[in-house]
Each structure stands twice: as C-alpha cells, then as structure tokens.
Swiss-Prot record:
It is found in: Cytoplasm. Pathway: Amino-acid biosynthesis; S-adenosyl-L-methionine biosynthesis; S-adenosyl-L-methionine from L-methionine: step 1/1. Keywords: ATP-binding, Cytoplasm, Magnesium, Metal-binding, Nucleotide-binding, One-carbon metabolism, Potassium, Transferase. One of its GO terms (molecular function) is magnesium ion binding. Its EC number is 2.5.1.6. Homotetramer; dimer of dimers. HAMAP family: S_AdoMet_synth1 (MF_00086). The lineage of its organism: Bacteria, Pseudomonadati, Pseudomonadota, Gammaproteobacteria, Moraxellales. Residues 100-110 are annotated as: Flexible loop. It catalyses: L-methionine + ATP + H2O = S-adenosyl-L-methionine + phosphate + diphosphate. It comes from Psychrobacter cryohalolentis (strain ATCC BAA-1226 / DSM 17306 / VKM B-2378 / K5). GO terms for cellular component: cytoplasm. This is S-adenosylmethionine synthase.
Amino acid sequence: MREYNLFTSESVSEGHPDKMADQISDAILDAILRQDLHARVACETLVKTGAVVLAGEITTTANIDVERIVRDTVNGIGYHHSDLGFDGETCAVINMLGKQSPEIAQGVDRADPEEQGAGDQGLMFGYASNETEVLMPAPIEYAHRLMERQSELRRAGELPWLRPDAKAQVTLKYDGNKPVAIDAVVLSTQHDPSISQADLQEAIMESIIKQVLPAELLHAGTRYHINPTGKFVIGGPVGDAGLTGRKIIVDTYGGMARHGGGAFSGKDPSKVDRSAAYAVRYVAKNIVAAGIADRCEVQVSYAIGVAEPTSISINTFGTNKISNDEIISLIRTHFDLRPYGITRMLNLLQPMYQQTASFGHFGRQGSETAFTWEKTDKAKILKADAGL
C-alpha cells in the first residue's frame, strides 16, 4: 500500500496583532530609508489594547514623525474605529527608541563598503521547491493566498462584515515530494457581530476557499474548519498582544525548511538576519529554477564584524543533478554573500519593506523595487555552468 505524508503550514492576516507589529516596525524603517539610506535601524513594536510601544536602536540623520507613521499604519491595516477595539487615531504611542551601540557600529562600518562586516553572528536558511509555480512549499503558499483573499474582500467591501484579524492553516497530502491532495483547511476570521455563523461559513467557503485552492487538490474527504470556535468578534490587539518577530515561520517556509531564529521586520539590510535570509532564498530559488535540484535548502552563517560568511552549506534532499560540492562552488562563483554584496546584488537599500511584512516574505511580487530575491535571473548561467 502506498504511503502518504501530511504536512501543515499556517498564515495570518495583516490584522493579526503580531503582523501589525511587524508592519509598524517596517513602516518606520521605510520612512527612515526615504531620507537616509545609510541608517542603522532595529525597531521593535508591541501592540496591546489602546497602546503601541516602540523600542530598539536607530542611528540616522532622518527626521521622521514616528507617532504619525504608527497611526497611519494602524489605520491602514483597518483598525480605525473604537467599535473594532483599537483605533489608530486614539491609541497611545510610547516611543522608547534609542541609538545603536557604538561597539556594534565599529564592527559593521568600514571605510571600504565592500568590507562591511555582518551586523551580528548568526545562521540563516533559504529554501525552494519546484512543487509550486513560485517555487515555494504548497502548504504555506496556499495559506498565504487564503489570507490575501480575505484581505482583498474586506478592503473591497464585498464581505462587509469581515474584520482585519484572521488565520489560515492548510494540510497537504504528499506522494513523495509531490502534493497530491488537500487534507484539511482551517480558516478563522474576525467578523462583525451581525453575521450568523451559517452565513459566514458559506461565504468563506464560496468566496475565499473555493476561489483560492486548486479544485484538483480538493476532494470529498477534505475537511474544512471555518471559525470552528464559533464567534470571533474580539480580535486584533484586544484579543492578544502582538510583537515584532513572533511569526518567523509564517514569514518564511511554513516549517518546511529550517530557520536560523532571526526575525526580519524593523531591520535594515546591515542585519544579516534579514538580508542574508533573502539572499539564500535567492540562491535556492535560482538553483531550483535552473533544474540543478528539485528541492534546495541553503544555510549561511556569519561572525559579527566579519564580511565573509563563516560557512555555506546545502541540502538537496537527494534531488540534485550534480554533486553538492559542485553546487556550492557555483554559489561561491555567482553570488556575493558578503553583507555589502547582498545589499548591492538585491538592491536592498530601498523603502520597500512594509509590503513584505504581511502574507510572507517569499514567493511573492510587489512594487518594482520589492522582492528582488524572487528573481530567477541567475538560472540560465547556473544551468550552463552545471552542464545541464
């Protein structure tokens, strides 16, 4: 009898409190980068009923209105009325931002930009798989798209009873490395008190789930759990506190690949937690796009103040067409994984980070300057050099 494996990933909406915090942190980063491309930013956010608290270290020549940025971001997410439990115009904004330690700065800054050191030690992973068109794992890809659809319908007013907070979870059945069926779907969305559970469940099924998930993967045995606890009126920061960097698996590969532990939002590109994670996604995606492997996980590590990575390693899960040593040689030849090299290679000194802070950092397109790490412009030369 053939054996199947199940794998589950989740996503959350832009109105989830942790994602609110991420978006606020990245909105502040973007505002600073519009004035000062050489700023050092590490901005953390806490949201809870009636308050937004900012903490972290920022060194910049930019002069920004932090409070206004916070309020505009909260309102833009959809929390703009007291009936929702949180109002961007009336919430308290507590600013505890300071400056970056000069001891860190001396290890990062260099007279020659090429020798810019890593902002911290750490390890980062990048991953790609040919199981979806965007070379992402199917469970997280579909979970993100469910949340994007919820947001689109809410913002367009097509389902006017939708509120900003929501979560989705998708379980895929795999035959080897190939997803063959959706085993279970969980979707919970905040809503106005006026909507009945029966009407909500029907609308979510017809307008979100069936519009997003491939019909060929749904079957008679697929299980659906739509707002399984019943009412979900109280949500956002009223229901739960939110913190920057608490959705690192949602932000990346839904658990399908390993994670080095560092979060992304609120960090400028000198922080390799963010920039190097983007870089190794770029590496892995181009390797898979080139047909060198069907699945590829790349790990890179750094020492604080040192430009060159302390290690580069890969796992192709037995799907490689050339040896792993040959693949690593190609990586070293075609990708500059020093911090400054990454920033230049991916054009990361751009105010484009807020759009990455919800619905995942990978497998997406955005503005012209965003998601440069999703390009497959190295695939052709990698394939040629691999002799494929």
